[in-house]
A protein has these predicted regions:
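Short, Lys/Arg-rich N-terminal segment immediately upstream of the first membrane anchor
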Residues: 1-6, 419
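N-terminal maturation segment of proteins
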Residues: 9-607
């Protein structure tokens, strides 16, 4: 285990222990200095969330495990308590700055203030979206938490699982009440979203109780616990099945009935403006996700310009490679490219292994070049693995999970290999660079390497920063690293990936600010990206239930590129891209305006 990470993990455990035991009066009541105050708020926030404490994996099955049999209530009272906590924390932050702070402390204060202000701003809306969707909500999050996160390393851990299973039944009742209240206040999801939710709810209750994942996952994990006998394991499984049948499945059936009623009451309008305060909710979502003051109109216009620029570059490559005719729609020319020999790996075990080997070769080439372009090359290894087969139906084409805080797990790029045709050879280089190095893997590993700052700085997640960096990395791999030299089709893959994010700017704002329909959004995305219709349908339905989130990627990339151009103009021949990357990465995630201030400060201080 990395020594610094080991110390960080020990520090987190110690902070939580202090909070649980009340061992430090000064920690709770009069923290000395900003960093101690931020750590106090971070720990208090963790203590409010049993799921977060379990996810950290620090205290479960220890003497300080007070949380391992609990779940956070899904009630308005719990929401109000969380809002009150955040408002009090924000008031307290003003006692520590920003006056008199310099360097990292001033940056820490600004990041913390932005995060707290954003949460308070979102809390203005009691009904700011849809509580249950195909991607989010307790019916998505809690089954995954119970089966994948809750630890079962002892008989006690299994008993606590049963307690949480009972609590899940209570939360389903709370969800039923809250979705019904939302409906009564005019908050109804579009009909196509209700159908997706119904599909998932019905699939959840379809299995026989004895074969249900909430029972079988317990059985599977108990097999690895030597201290639990076969008799004890059988009894624990029996109890889990009983709770499932008596508490959980009835809750799901109530939600099914409620959503069947919703389906008769709703319509197909896609945008968030369909609900009360929808325009204000969308403006707040854009501010939160992009971390800027850009309006929906600004973002829509930006997207249209980027789509036209990228389309022209893609057409030039297709023309040069003799793929299709200029008069053909882009989607048809992309389909013709995919039919070329060698572009699709065989959909066999051997073909899947060959695809992973190809991705590994791309990663190794990037890592050989990285020291010439980065002062700090993260030491954390990266693994390339397939999405588990049982998850691949509902999983995206690929995604990245960062290294463990304690260094026990490497960064991992998961690629969905259900159908190798989903990822043609010409798209793989940009995909690997975005999710791996120097994209998300460098950015996530850099955050773990920051020293002398509160834990919040290592844990902070800003979509515009993280996704903006990954898109910047795709372009930098071409302009700085030369990774697409002699590979025009690989460069086409990079442009298609960027086009996908640019089209999102148009579609997200079209849906939520311009009255676009689901079908209009799907047609626009297919026309301009050439991606498969089924994949685009899933994407558009994601934008419908997560307003604003999809705009952060391209906004972030363009902001970082603009910061670089500004620094190059100021410094001229003194500009060093390695130093620029160090400034952007080695302070961790932050809002884009703060990142720009950081870059300008670096330029001003540059010799």
């Amino acid at each position: 285990m990395n020594t610094r990470l080991k110390k960080t993990l020990a520090a987190v455990a110690a902070l939580v222990a202090i909070g649980l035991t009340g061992a430090s009066f000064w920690f709770w009541f009069t923290p000395v200095g900003l960093n101690n105050y931020i750590n106090k708020i971070t720990v208090q926030s963790l203590l409010r969330s049993p799921e977060s404490l379990t996810s950290l994996g620090l205290l479960d099955d220890t003497l300080l495990d007070f949380h391992g049999d609990k779940l956070t209530p899904f009630t308005r009272e719990e929401e109000l308590a969380s809002i009150a906590f955040m408002r009090k924390a924000r008031e307290g932050l003003n006692r520590y700055g920003p006056q008199g702070l310099e360097g990292q402390e001033r940056l820490t204060w600004a990041i913390a203030a932005w995060m707290m202000d954003d949460q308070i701003a979102q809390a203005r809306f009691e009904r700011g979206g849809y509580r249950l969707t195909q991607l989010d909500g307790v019916t998505v999050q809690l089954p995954q938490f119970l089966t994948d996160v809750h630890p079962i390393r002892s008989h006690r851990g299994a008993q606590r699982y049963l307690k949480r299973l009972e609590a899940f039944g209570d939360i389903l009742q709370q969800a039923h009440q809250r979705v019904g209240e939302d409906r009564d206040h005019g908050v109804l999801p579009p009909d196509f979203i209700v159908r997706r939710v119904l599909e998932q709810l019905r699939a959840f209750v379809a299995a026989e109780p004895a074969q249900h994942v909430l029972v079988t996952s317990l059985q599977d994990r108990l097999k690895a616990v030597d201290s639990v006998s076969a008799t004890q394991a059988a009894e624990l499984s029996r109890q889990a099945q009983a709770i499932l049948e008596q508490r959980v499945l009835p809750g799901y059936r109530q939600l099914i009935a409620l959503h069947e009623a919703l389906l008769k009451q709703t319509d197909s309008r896609a945008g968030i403006e369909r609900i009360p305060q929808g325009r204000e909710i969308y403006a707040a979502a854009l501010a939160s996700h992009t971390t800027t003051g850009l309006s929906a109109e600004d973002i829509h216009s930006l997207g249209l310009r980027e789509v036209e620029r990228l389309k022209a570059e893609m057409v030039d490559i297709l023309d040069a490679q003799g793929i299709g005719r200029r008069s053909q729609p882009l989607a048809q020319r992309i389909a013709e490219l995919n039919r070329q020999p060698g572009q699709i790996f065989p959909n066999t075990d051997a073909g899947r292994a060959a695809m992973i080997a190809h991705l590994q070769a791309i990663h190794e080439r990037v890592m050989r070049a990285a020291p010439r372009h980065f002062k700090t090359v993260p030491p954390h290894p990266l693994e390339i693995v397939r999405v588990p087969e049982y998850q691949q139906d509902g999983s995206p084409g690929g995604y990245y999970n960062g290294p463990a805080l304690d260094g026990s797990r490497p960064g991992r790029f998961y690629i969905n290999l259900k159908d190798t045709a989903d990822n043609p050879r010409w798209t793989l280089a940009s995909f690997m660079i975005h999710e791996g190095a120097p994209g998300h893997h460098f950015q996530a590993a850099a955050a773990l390497s920051i020293t002398g700052v509160p834990l919040m700085r290592q844990m902070a997640n800003f979509t515009a920063y993280a996704e903006g960096w990954a898109l910047y990395a795709e372009r930098m791999a071409k302009t700085d690293m030369g990774l697409y030299e002699g590979d025009p089709l690989g460069d086409l893959g990079r442009l298609q990936a960027e086009m996908f994010r640019a089209a999102r700017l148009v579609v997200d704002t079209g849906l939520h600010a311009k009255g676009w329909s689901r079908e209009q959004a799907i047609q626009y995305m297919i026309e301009h990206t050439g991606m498969p219709a089924a994949e685009i349908e899933r994407e558009v339905e994601r934008y419908v239930v997560s307003p604003g989130q999809a705009t952060a990627y391209k906004v972030g990339q363009l902001a970082i590129l603009d910061m670089r151009r500004e620094a190059e103009a100021e410094l001229g021949t003194r500009f060093d891209a390695r130093e620029f990357h160090e400034v952007v990465l080695m302070n961790g995630g932050m809002p884009l305006d703060l990142l720009r201030d950081n870059v300008r400060r670096w330029v001003k201080q540059h010799p």
